[in-house]
Amino acid sequence: MNKNERIILNSHLAEQNKLVGFIENICDQHNIYNSYYANIVTSVSEAFDNAVIHGNNNDDEKNIIVDFVIQNDGFSFCITDQGNGFDFSSVADPTDINNPIEETGRGIFLMDILSDKLEFKNNGRTACMKFLIANINKEAADKRVNKLKAYMHSDIKQTSLN
């Protein structure tokens, strides 16, 4: 069982299938299934999409590196693009009803609530999502569900106001 694995993908959304296969193989090796698997696939896929579209500006001459690293308390997936990076703190909170309805920020929000820790490095060129497998429990699951419900509820309110 390898502790670290890497895949380098072309900066094209069609590479999503290779990414999901990479994640599936890792999850199979480590017996990770059910809802936690869905959290991993959704958040890592969203980070990949952001890297293709926003980081590399759909330039298929560029690559995206996906690293899998095992730590003592879980593991991380880190997605690195070849773009200029971005300031994570400038992304609007999509759950704040005072923010105008925008398409941006929702993916980062999903990456954040579906992982146990989201961190941006490399001036925003690398997004790392940590999953604390040792800490899978009802409390953590309830916290995620409540955040998602609050987001969905605020989105429904905003939609009904228009």
Give, region by region, the residue ranges found by the protein language model.
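Long, highly charged amphipathic alpha-helices
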Residues: 18-22, 113
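STAS-typified acidic loop motif
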Residues: 6-17
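Conserved beta-strand-loop-beta-strand hairpin that lines the nucleotide-binding pocket
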Residues: 1-6, 52-162
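Conserved short strand/loop->alpha-helix "switch" segment adjacent to the catalytic nucleotide/phosphoryl-transfer site
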Residues: 21-45, 100-101
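Conserved catalytic/ATP-binding subdomain
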Residues: 14, 35-38, 62
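Hydrophobic residues in the alpha-helical elements that line and stabilize the ATP-binding pocket
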Residues: 47, 51
